[in-house]
Amino acid sequence: MAGLVKGGLGSASLDLGGGLMVGALAAVNPVGSVHMPDGETFWAWPFEIDGEFGGRRPGADLVLAREPLPEQSRLKAERRLEPGANTTLCVVAVSADLTSAECKRVAMMAQDGLARAVRPAHTPFDGDVVFALTGGGVALGQDERPLHVAQLGSACADVLARAIARGVYSAT
């Protein structure tokens, strides 16, 4: 389950050019919702590529999300509001030669993708986590290395948001 809809396993990737690739895999089962208040548009819609999770966009009549945890009574009835009942487990991968500290930074940045795709994320009822790994391959060099790591982390956040939406879209 993802909120009140069926969860699933999703993946996404992005070619950054020059041999640099980022990818994400997500097992999606959060207590939070992946949909906007209309129940159809994914929170991750701004990051969608080529209609990969339905191509739905918010309409002009979209009601603003004012309720931080909608459908509480239904979530309680389905026993979703219990510690350990939900989680979103994620891994992001990059094809660059990152150090352990840089992988940690990329994982920290990729957490933003989870928060972009699920509302709310990281609740006391979730065990949300993001791991990062590197396949080596592309040498970043030392010139502007922090900038490259920041770009990779940002791209990982975007692909993770897509992977989460794809997991739910393919399951429903």
Give short role names for the model-derived ranges:
Residues 1-172:
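A structural signal for small-residue-enriched, beta-sheet-centric alpha/beta enzyme cores
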